[in-house]
Each structure stands twice: as structure tokens, then as C-alpha cells.
Design a protein with these regions (language model features):
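Short Lys/Arg-enriched alpha/beta "domain-start" segment
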Residues: 1-38, 428-507
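Ferredoxin-like iron-sulfur electron-transfer modules
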Residues: 502-525, 533-538
């Protein structure tokens, strides 16, 4: 949010409300002795103390000390540490840590404004939706689905509509432009079942959690950590420390941990390694367990307002996010991002100011704390993880190596070093005994299933009402009746849906249902997208 320059006296940074001489184009990150040890700087004649304070700063892979660029790190990959390219005229020296106390004094005024604005944003957002809840519960007239109604009006009128709260303690729908002109508070939902702070073990969620405790009563929100099975060891340890700290400070604050019922490596065997095209792990290991746990009465998906640590600086995609958004990742969730416009420097300054522990992963050089392995992680982070958490990474890395070798890739090590495993687009390395073959579609849809995961008719009820048995019957779709037959010989099923060629829409739905019956592995991802609660995976 603020502009940043080096502070040569403290070895830290200064914040400015406008561009000044020496303003940095990229937000730096603090570098601690653990990272310098990993890079082997001490073996090149440099000396520095092993202390809590950072020693220097990094801008991408350039390392700066009191405003002077000392060296660059070149050529890191998952197997190989980088080489250090010392800048001309720079000789090994004794490095002095950042004077954090003085740096915090010099940045205190602007940080005070920044954090209080975030607290006010959290409080205002919480109060707006908490009051909407009270209004919603006051009268049956309020319990209409105003959000769905607004969407329908939008489609008909071809203009953006908004749900607003009126002075008479009711809701109304009006054009968004009119609502903004009249100063109405636009609501993305008329009812929130649960307020949560999402905690990941990273610095951003750590700051947001603390801001939430300063803005919202501890009885009114929950802290949820998703243990994906990919967690870095220090992230798990930090979560336990954070839980103990806040439980002591706020005994009524609830902490919950969401986990999938199955091991992530089991899913690797069934679905294949995640890739930049098939990023299944986020929905299966994180989103599905989290929102399944939050379901309310009647198996319905809870309407949730999540305070998250998303920051625009992190990626081009996130730079386009609104500070409050509905359906960003999940249809029934509103995401509120209090620190959307903060820089990583400001996040670290907050942690330093209040004496919060820094995740060990940052101290060892990881730029973004997340999963232990990820198709979107950088070669740099892959290198740091493999050299500092090798034992935890090994089961995943060995699985990748085995897959690459099995596919007879020449020079598998270079293939993995270059990150080519992350670009898997097909299912060549998935060895499944289940298969489906659509034999014909005119006039009848004839299909053969081999070793399906479910009975072929399991999902047909989601398409239309049907009567009959597992062998034959009828289904009624758009006032037309279609008969079906299902025969099986061991693990092979043959199905025929009569005269369905006259309804391509029905054939498309049947194909989806049969595909799901063939390959469904109970990952739970579909259940949390069901808006009515009719779908349940067990």
C-alpha cells in the first residue's frame, strides 16, 4: 500500500505515502540467518550472527544489505541449490542484523493508519452482515431468497441489481447504480450462518486472524485450519502455537481443523499428480473438507463470510479481486480481504511490531508458505523445501520420479528439474481399471461400463424421476417417458436408453451421470457445490 525505500542506518525499510527518490518497484522480503546458511554464505568467508532479527532483504533473487546489492542467487531447482554471484567490488564482510526496534519506530505512524483501517473494514463488514442476519430473522417476508431474485431480475433487465437493507428492517432489490447513488449498503447475502477466519500457517492469514480478534467478539467467529496432507511441518507447529496463544487470550474463540477422509497420496494414485491444468488438490483436500464441515441443518451448505489473507501483490489474478466478493471460489461463500492492498513488507512489519512468531519456512527462504509441493510453486521454493524438509517431501517426489520413469521420459532428472511434471494435461500416468465406452447414440444411447466405481444407475435420479429396478425401468424427462435396460456380466455393464436421440439434452445428462458412476472416488468436491443439500457423499 505504501511506497518503500531502504533505511541504510537501521538496515531495514522506510514507508512513504508517495513516491520519493529511491522508491523500490518490488516489495522486498526479510532474509534471516537460516536462509544464508542454506545458501552457504558462511562458507564463502561472510560472518553474521544467528539471531531472531533479519540480516538483510531480498528482491526476487537479489540480496540487499543496507541499500547495497551484495549478490544474486542463480539457477535453483528442486534438486540443486543456487550459485551465488557476488556483485563487483563486494568482498566478504561481517553482517549486522536489522535494527528492528528503530525500524518499527520509524514506520509506526503509517502502520498505525494501515492496521486501523483494516480493523475498521473487518468491523464494518461483520456488523453489516450481523445486522442483516437480525433483519432476516425478524419477519418471514425477509426469508425470501433475495440473492436469487436479484440474479433473475439481472437476466431480464440486463442491468446489475443489488440487494439492499431498507430503513423499515426489510430487504429490497434495486439497480446497483441507483443503490450507489442513494448511498445504500449493498449486501452480497441477506443471511450469514457462520463468520470464519481462514488460517493457513502463512504470514498473511496470521495477520488477518489477529486483526479479527481486535475487531470481532471472539464468540462470533471461528478459526479454521485446513490440514490438506501437504502441510509444511512448521505450519502445523505454528497453528498449534497460535491456537494455544489465542485460546489463552480468548477462551471462547473456537478453533477447528478440516481434513479429507483419505490420504492425499491415495488420491495421487487415483487421480494422478496435480498439475497446472488439473489442480484438483485445492478443491479435494482443502475446499471440500472445509465447507463439508460447515454444513448446517438439513445437510445444506452454510452461507459463510470468510476473512482471508489474500493480497493483490501476490499475483496478477489476485490483483483483480474485489475486497469483498461472493462466489470467488465457492458459491455460498463471501470472501472479505482486509489486507488486500498490503505489501509483504507491511505484513512482516505487523508481525515484528506485535512480536508474533515467524513461520520457520520463511526464515529458511520460502517466499510463499503453502503446500509442501505444488504445480504452481517456483523452482526456488521447490529447492528450499527439498533441502530443508526432504523427509516430508520424499513420498511425493519419489511418486513423481516413479511416474516419469514409468512413462519412459529420457533424462527424468532434467525433466523434473525443469518442472515439466507440473504441466501434465492428460491421464497417461493414471492406471485405472474402470472404463466407459459410448457405443452408439441413435436412436438409442448404448453404453458399456467396465468395473465402474458405482452401480451405473446411481446418479440417474439426479436427472429425472425414474421407476423400475437395476435391470430395467423408465425415466420421465420433460413430460416424455424413456425406457432403459441394464445388463451385467461380472464387472461389465451394458446399458441402453431407448429413443433418447430425440433429446440431446437428456443424452448429455445421462452421459454425465454414467461418467460419474464409472469414475467417482468419493472425493467430496461435488457435495459442497450442491446448493440444496440433496447430494451427500458417504
Amino acid at each position: 500500500m505504501y511506497k518503500i525505500t531502504w533505511d541504510k542506518e537501521t538496515g531495514g525499510v522506510l514507508l512513504h505515502s508517495r513516491i520519493v527518490e529511491g522508491t523500490l518497484g518490488i516489495s522486498p522480503r526479510p532474509v534471516f540467518f537460516e536462509e544464508l546458511d542454506l545458501l552457504g554464505l558462511d562458507k564463502l568467508g561472510w560472518t553474521y550472527p544467528h539471531v531472531e532479527e533479519p540480516i538483510m532483504w531480498a528482491v526476487n533473487k537479489q540480496y540487499w544489505y543496507r541499500g547495497v546489492r551484495l549478490f544474486d542467487a542463480k539457477g535453483a531447482n528442486i534438486y540443486t541449490k543456487p550459485t551465488l554471484e557476488i556483485q563487483p567490488g563486494i568482498e566478504p564482510m561481517e553482517l549486522v542484523p536489522v535494527d528492528v526496534k528503530k525500524m518499527l519506530q520509524r514506520t509506526s505512524d503509517l502502520m498505525f493508519v494501515l492496521e486501523n483501517e483494516a480493523i475498521e473494514f473487518i468491523r464494518d463488514t461483520y456488523l453489516a452482515y450481523a445486522k442483516a442476519n437480525k433483519t432476516y430473522n425478524k419477519a418471514d417476508a425477509n426469508k425470501l431468497d433475495f440473492e436469487t431474485m436479484a440474479e433473475r431480475v439481472e437476466k431480464k433487465s440486463k442491468q446489475r441489481m443489488a440487494v439492499v437493507k431498507q430503513d423499515c428492517d426489510s430487504f429490497d432489490i434495486m439497480p446497483l447504480a441507483t443503490a450507489e447513488k442513494e448511498g445504500k449498503r449493498v449486501l452480497l447475502s441477506t443471511k450469514i450462518d457462520r463468520f470464519i477466519a481462514s488460517f493457513s500457517g502463512g504470514k498473511d492469514s496470521q495477520v488477518v486472524l489477529d486483526l479479527c480478534t481486535r475487531a470481532i467478539p471472539p464468540t462470533d467467529f471461528e478459526v479454521i485450519y485446513s490440514d490438506t496432507g501437504y502441510e509444511l511441518p512448521p505450519s502445523l507447529a505454528l497453528y498449534k502455537d497460535v491456537e494455544a496463544y489465542y485460546k489463552k487470550k480468548f477462551p471462547s474463540l473456537r478453533f477447528l481443523t478440516a481434513r479429507n477422509h483419505e490420504s492425499v497420496l491415495n488420491y495421487w494414485d487415483k487421480i494422478g499428480t496435480p498439475s497446472d491444468n488439473h489442480r484438483w488438490c485445492c478443491s479435494v483436500m482443502k475446499t471440500a473438507p472445509l465447507y463439508r464441515m460447515l454444513k448446517v441443518e438439513g445437510n445444506k451448505q452454510a452461507r459463510v463470510l470468510t476473512f482471508d489473507g489474500v493480497r493483490a501483490e501476490e499475483s496478477v489474478r489476485r490483483s483483480g479481486y474485489n475486497r469483498i466478493g461472493k462466489g470467488v471460489k465457492h458459491s455460498t461463500v463471501i470472501n472479505a480481504s482486509p489486507i488486500l492492498f498490503w505489501s509483504s513488507v507491511e505484513v512482516f512489519l505487523y508481525l515484528f511490531r506485535y512480536g508474533f512468531p515467524i513461520n520457520i519456512a520463511y526464515r529458511r527462504g520460502i517466499t510463499r508458505v503453502g503446500c509442501i509441493i505444488c504445480p504452481f510453486s517456483s523452482e526456488w521454493n521447490d529447492m528450499v523445501v527439498n533441502h530443508t524438509f526432504h523427509e516430508e517431501l520424499e513420498p511425493f517426489l519419489s511418486r513423481i520420479e516413479d511416474n516419469v520413469k514409468r512413462n519412459k521420459v529420457q533424462d527424468f532428472r532434467n525433466y523434473i528439474e525443469d518442472g515439466n511434471w507440473k504441466r501434465r494435461a492428460g491421464g497417461r500416468d493414471i492406471h485405472s481399471s474402470s472404463a466407459i465406452d459410448f457405443l452408439s447414440s441413435k436412436p438409442d444411447l448404448n453404453v458399456m461400463l467396465i468395473k465402474p466405481q458405482k452401480h451405473p444407475l446411481t446418479w440417474i435420479s439426479a436427472i429425472a424421476p425414474f421407476t423400475g429396478s437395476e435391470k430395467q425401468g423408465e425415466l420421465k424427462y420433460r413430460n416424455e417417458v424413456y425406457s432403459y435396460k441394464c445388463e451385467n456380466n461380472g464387472d461389465v455393464y451394458s446399458l441402453s436408453f431407448k429413443n433418447t436421440a430425440k433429446s440431446l439434452a437428456l443424452q448429455g445428462l445421462i452421459k454425465r451421470a454414467l461418467n460419474k458412476a464409472t469414475f467417482c472416488i468419493n472425493c467430496e468436491a461435488c457435495e459442497v457445490e450442491c446448493p440444496t443439500g440433496a447430494l451427500s457423499i458417504s
